[in-house]
Amino acid sequence: MSVRKLKPITPGQRFRVVNGYDAITTDKPERSLIAPIKNSGGRNSQGKMTMRYTGGGHKQRYRIIDFKRTKDGIPATVKSIEYDPNRTAFIALLAYADGEKTYIIAQNGLKVGQKLVSGPESQPEIGNTLPLSRIPLGTVISCIELRPGQGAVIARSAGTFAQLMARDGKYATIKMPSGETRLILLTCSATIGAVSNSDHQLVVSGKAGRTRWLGRRPRTRPVAMNPVDHPMGGGEGRSSGGHPRSRNGLPAKGYRTRSKKNPSNKYIVERRKK
């Protein structure tokens, strides 16, 4: 993994830092595993805006990812490491021994030609998926299930990982990417290794246009709005906006919004550090 800093031959390239894409082996996706995406522009079925600051961007096709890895005991070969425009991590194309092909989230260190196996009998090696009950303590893991059979929902972004800290009864203690320590059932599965493209955090857009290519629109500062649009809007001249607030009036900058009655609170051993 590496990044490239471009020469400042234009204003848009002066501060731009791009991904080197050293790990990418092909730019042609598997046609049987892609699907169309309709750009909603942040609007719902009624045409009303439900998400601000999104819309436009380059046309993309969705890559169908296997987050469950349920083909236990069937060996698979890594055919390629590919770029996915819909996520920050790279993806890997697997060809199973029975002829099926699937995409998975690629882990750091995954190579073309490598053999992968999922299931409780597989070895704890990079890219293999096992139940938490069969993973050695202290192992770096990613693509973790929160409920058995649900599919991976935790640690799927570029460079993220969690760590298996302990086992007690029917639960495993996991150090989450956020720093939170949480209990997860031992029957949930996880993949060995950290997620690929760990240098993604070093990428700098360099110009507003490239951010628009990604489908992100300009964000309006709350203090520049009218009072009808935001609690921090209005005032004579350039005002500070008063106490920082969110759009719906809740205090910003450190205010805890998590419900004290949330049923999953009992599974949190230690809150994340702020």
From Swiss-Prot:
GO terms for cellular component: large ribosomal subunit. Residues 214-274 are annotated as: Disordered. It holds the Pfam family Ribosomal_L2. The keyword rRNA-binding applies. The keyword RNA-binding applies. Keywords: Ribonucleoprotein, Ribosomal protein, RNA-binding, rRNA-binding. SMART domains: Ribosomal_L2, Ribosomal_L2_C. It comes from the Bacteria. InterPro entries: NA-bd_OB-fold, Rib_uL2_dom2, Ribosomal_uL2, Ribosomal_uL2_bac/org-type, Ribosomal_uL2_C, Ribosomal_uL2_dom3, Ribosomal_uL2_RNA-bd_dom, Translation_prot_SH3-like_sf. GO terms for molecular function: rRNA binding; structural constituent of ribosome; transferase activity. One of its GO terms (biological process) is cytoplasmic translation. Part of the 50S ribosomal subunit. Forms a bridge to the 30S subunit in the 70S ribosome. PANTHER family: LARGE RIBOSOMAL SUBUNIT PROTEIN UL2M (PTHR13691:SF5), RIBOSOMAL PROTEIN L2 (PTHR13691). Belongs to the universal ribosomal protein uL2 family. One of the primary rRNA binding proteins. Required for association of the 30S and 50S subunits to form the 70S ribosome, for tRNA binding and peptide bond formation. It has been suggested to have peptidyltransferase activity; this is somewhat controversial. Makes several contacts with the 16S rRNA in the 70S ribosome. This is Large ribosomal subunit protein uL2. It comes from Flavobacterium johnsoniae (strain ATCC 17061 / DSM 2064 / JCM 8514 / BCRC 14874 / CCUG 350202 / NBRC 14942 / NCIMB 11054 / UW101) (Cytophaga johnsonae).
